[in-house]
Regions:
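Mid-domain alpha/beta scaffold segments of enzyme catalytic cores
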Residues: 1-28, 33, 106
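Mid-to-C-terminal alpha-helical segments outside catalytic/metal-binding sites
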Residues: 133-163
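Conserved, mostly hydrophobic/aromatic
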Residues: 11, 19, 42, 98, ...
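Active-site micro-motifs of SAM-dependent methyltransferase domains
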Residues: 26, 129, 159
Length: 163
């Protein structure tokens, strides 16, 4: 974690508009102090962050850590086991977004859109670890309008990285 902010600043100066972290693979918990410092820097820069959120409790922690922040935080890898928690956290924290690679329920897109709005969904496939079609087909076969599907596939992420 040493020099994390200066490293991120160099990447920002190179044109990076989005960052990603993998706490469960990197062996740390979202509540650690260096991550809070990184979140504060991202908020000051107005930069979005993708953060893996595969464990129950992490969406709640991330919501608490970003309370009052305006920088978008995109929850990645949310699945049936923690989707309810993620939606509750998103309802309380308007800067949280949901990446869709773990959204496998038949009515998953409709349920999330009805709960927090289609504008908070960011398409993700999980590729190359997962088949692209297994993430795309539930969206294409959902009852969302073509305009809403376009928001999920392209427009929502574009809006966040161009802000």
């Amino acid at each position: 974690f040493r020099d994390m902010i200066s490293e991120a600043e160099r990447r920002r100066q190179q044109g990076f508009r989005l960052f990603r972290v993998f706490p469960h693979l990197q062996g740390w918990q979202p509540r650690i102090a260096p991550f809070r410092t990184f979140l504060q820097w991202l908020n000051e820069q107005g930069l979005p962050l993708l953060v893996d959120c595969p464990q129950v409790g992490w969406a709640s922690e991330l919501a608490e850590l970003t309370q009052g922040s305006s920088a978008p935080l995109i929850l990645v890898g949310v699945h049936e086991g923690n989707l309810g928690e993620a939606l509750s956290a998103m309802s309380a924290c308007p800067n949280l977004y949901l990446e869709t690679s773990g959204l496998k329920q038949p009515d998953g897109y409709e349920m999330v859109a009805a709960t927090v709005g289609v504008e908070r969904l960011i398409f993700g496939s999980g590729a190359p670890l997962h088949y692209f079609a297994s993430a795309l087909l539930p969206l294409l076969h959902s009852s969302l309008s073509d305009e809403e599907k376009r928001k999920v596939l392209v427009d929502n992420l574009r809006r966040l990285v161009q802000a």
